[in-house]
UniProtKB/Swiss-Prot annotation:
Listed GO MF terms: iron ion binding
UniProtKB keywords: Iron
Role played: Could be a mediator in iron transactions between iron acquisition and iron-requiring processes, such as synthesis and/or repair of Fe-S clusters in biosynthetic enzymes.
Protein name: Probable Fe(2+)-trafficking protein
A Gene Ontology biological process term: cellular response to oxidative stress
InterPro entries cross-referenced by the UniProt entry: Fe_traffick_prot_YggX, Fe_traffick_prot_YggX_sf
Domain of life: Bacteria
Any one annotated GO CC term: cytosol
Family designation: Belongs to the Fe(2+)-trafficking protein family.
Cited Pfam families: Iron_traffic (PF04362)
Length: 90
């Protein structure tokens, strides 16, 4: 049986992640409150942040920035794109 959550991002019941995304209190909070669909949305948003801000994920300060953005994306006011960002046209 799938792990179901009341997703904080989608505002509805949805299938959750198979396991916490990382071993921490935040990872457990995401596992309990974020759907797999919303997590996929975050990974796309994170890619945009990495590219637009030219982040280097092995640098501690860039990791901290991404964690702050993740918390805002799921549990705060939301994570915004840089002002210069132009979404790709499909």
């Amino acid at each position: 049986m799938a792990h179901m959550v009341k997703c904080v991002k989608l505002g509805r019941e949805a299938e959750g992640l198979e396991e916490p995304p990382f071993d921490s209190e935040l990872g457990q909070k995401i596992y309990n409150n974020v759907s797999a669909e919303a997590w996929r949305g975050w990974t796309e948003h994170q890619k945009m942040l990495l590219n637009e801000y030219r982040l280097q994920p092995w640098k501690k300060e860039h990791q901290e920035f991404l964690v702050q953005q993740m918390e805002a994306y799921f549990f705060g006011e939301g994570s915004e794109a840089p002002k210069e960002f132009v979404p790709p046209s499909h």
